[in-house]
A protein has these predicted regions:
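ACP-dependent fatty acid/polyketide chain-elongation machinery
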Residues: 1-68
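Acyl-thioester C-C bond-transforming condensing/cleaving domain
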Residues: 2-4, 20, 31-37, 88-100, ...
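Structured loops at beta-to-helix junctions and adjacent beta-edge loops in soluble globular domains
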Residues: 12, 107-109
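Generic hydrophobic secondary-structure packing signal
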Residues: 24, 75-82, 167, 171
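Aromatic side chains
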Residues: 25, 42, 63, 75-78, ...
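A glycine- and small-residue-enriched flexible loop/hinge segment at structural boundaries
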Residues: 41-92, 141-155
Length: 223
């Protein structure tokens, strides 16, 4: 039998519809806030579903330089900000002696959907020469992992998980196993998603995966 290492959680970060840090998030949970309201990220007038749980009032400039954030898809910004929060909460430090034993795994179901959608429109209306050279790096699901690893200086195991709604949980599970087997000393892990776009909402609605109770969005989720 392998000699499994004990695994513990040392820090938490959160960018959510009910709070943009762990304290706000816990308070939102305690108050029973669900974060669901009318869509503001785009005009949903032609969509059968007109509400979503959006991340609001996030001050990304507190964590990411403005010039950098323009080159990052929204999902990657969420992932990096939450990772930075969790790392700070943990009290850990990364240096030359331990960097190779600290890794990052962040899951994402669709990655940079907003980037893909906006650049497809540019391609259609303005031609291929106007497509951003950052399109592919911004779009790929592993960009949140890569950017978080660079920002924190983590040089250990690094990968991304793309398993739909289970991506974040799978990222945590994969990290748990690496720690349990002694392949890493610490892992920054979780999930990041930003699929509230015209295409994302239309696609989920067409799949009958969304509620159309637009008159009462706060009570629309009925599992």
């Amino acid at each position: 039998m392998p000699n499994f290492h004990r695994v513990v959680i040392t820090g938490i970060g959160a960018v959510t519809p009910i709070g943009n840090n762990i304290d706000e998030y816990l308070l939102g949970l305690q108050k029973g806030i669900n974060g669901v309201s009318g869509i503001t990220l785009f005009d949903p007038v032609e969509h059968p579903c007109k509400f979503a749980a959006e991340v609001k009032n996030l001050k990304s400039e507190d964590f990411i330089e403005a010039k950098e954030s323009k080159r990052w898809d929204r999902f990657a910004q969420f992932g990096v900000i939450a990772a930075k929060q969790a790392f700070k909460d943990s009290g850990l430090e990364i240096n030359e002696s331990n960097a190779s034993k600290i890794g990052v795994i962040i899951g994402s179901g669709v990655g940079g959907l907003l980037t893909m959608e906006s650049q497809a429109q540019i391609l259609s209306h303005k031609g291929p020469k106007r497509v951003s050279p950052f399109t592919v790096p911004m779009m790929i699901p592993n960009m949140a992992t890569g950017l978080a690893a660079i920002a924190l200086g983590a040089k250990g195991p690094s990968s991304a998980v793309s398993t739909a709604c289970a991506a974040g949980s799978n990222a945590i599970g994969d990290s748990f196993r690496l720690l349990q087997l002694g392949k890493a000393d610490a892992m920054i892990c979780g999930g990041a998603e930003a699929s509230i776009t015209p295409l994302g909402v239309a696609g989920f609605a067409s799949a009958k995966a969304l509620s159309f109770r637009n008159e009462s969005p706060e009570t629309a989720s009925r599992p």
